[in-house]
Amino acid sequence: MEENFFKLILITNKQQISVEEYLDFVCACVQSGVTSVQLREKELSYRELLGFGEALKSILDPLEIPLIVSDSVSVCLDLDATGVHLGQTDGDVIEARELLGSDKIIGWNVNTLDQLLNANTLPIDYLGLSAMFATQNKPDATNLWGFSGLEQAVSLCEHPIVAIGGIDESNASKVIDAGAAGIAAIGVFHSAQNPSSVTKALREIVDRGLRC
């Protein structure tokens, strides 16, 4: 698996859009620079989630773009997805690693410094730092890391950090400069009038920052 799969992660938010139309949107973003897609659809049933996941894999697999499943090891296994992104209430990471084996990616979401320090001993591939800034997609976020919090987290963390929450073209450069290995986002992609253009701009920002 390419090490920089977490450079620019598109987190899904299909809502009422048809699957066909949404796949066109995802494909446009992937062709413009998204490096992996995170399946996050909390309103779907297990069966619906599998169906949507299979549809995503049908366009992502030929392009060798990883599909990461939010919250569920079982969905990851049933889809044979590339990996899983787990939150603090989504089960035991060590057990997840035993179930998934060494070939699957595991991301672990943290909201506090204590959680981050604990993550240093866990068998994960990257750490999701959430939320960076205020965002409509995480209205209940009680801790916003901001740039200084991200810098502190990077200095203390043993894993690559993917910054999540409220990131767009206006702040992505500073996020990478503060030490993030990548960014994951919902709103900046889904609210864009031209998703391809926004994706290209974000990818250029990330690539430029990581080269420095």
Curated annotation (Swiss-Prot):
Binding site for 4-amino-2-methyl-5-(diphosphooxymethyl)pyrimidine: Q38, L39, R40, E41, K42, K138
Residue numbers binding Mg(2+): D71, D90
Details of cofactor binding: Binds 1 Mg(2+) ion per subunit.
Keywords carried by this UniProt record: Magnesium, Metal-binding, Thiamine biosynthesis, Transferase
GO terms under cellular component: cytoplasm
This protein's pathway: Cofactor biosynthesis; thiamine diphosphate biosynthesis; thiamine phosphate from 4-amino-2-methyl-5-diphosphomethylpyrimidine and 4-methyl-5-(2-phosphoethyl)-thiazole: step 1/1
BP terms from Gene Ontology: thiamine biosynthetic process; thiamine diphosphate biosynthetic process
Cofactor: Mg(2+)
Binding site for 2-[(2R,5Z)-2-carboxy-4-methylthiazol-5(2H)-ylidene]ethyl phosphate: G166
Protein EC: 2.5.1.3
SUPFAM superfamilies reported in the protein's UniProt record: Thiamin phosphate synthase
Molecular function in Gene Ontology: magnesium ion binding; thiamine-phosphate diphosphorylase activity
Reactions catalysed, as given in the entry: 2-[(2R,5Z)-2-carboxy-4-methylthiazol-5(2H)-ylidene]ethyl phosphate + 4-amino-2-methyl-5-(diphosphooxymethyl)pyrimidine + 2 H(+) = thiamine phosphate + CO2 + diphosphate; 2-(2-carboxy-4-methylthiazol-5-yl)ethyl phosphate + 4-amino-2-methyl-5-(diphosphooxymethyl)pyrimidine + 2 H(+) = thiamine phosphate + CO2 + diphosphate; 4-methyl-5-(2-phosphooxyethyl)-thiazole + 4-amino-2-methyl-5-(diphosphooxymethyl)pyrimidine + H(+) = thiamine phosphate + diphosphate
Similarity section: Belongs to the thiamine-phosphate synthase family.
Function per UniProt: Condenses 4-methyl-5-(beta-hydroxyethyl)thiazole monophosphate (THZ-P) and 2-methyl-4-amino-5-hydroxymethyl pyrimidine pyrophosphate (HMP-PP) to form thiamine monophosphate (TMP).
Protein name: Thiamine-phosphate synthase
Source organism per UniProt: Chlamydia abortus (strain DSM 27085 / S26/3) (Chlamydophila abortus)
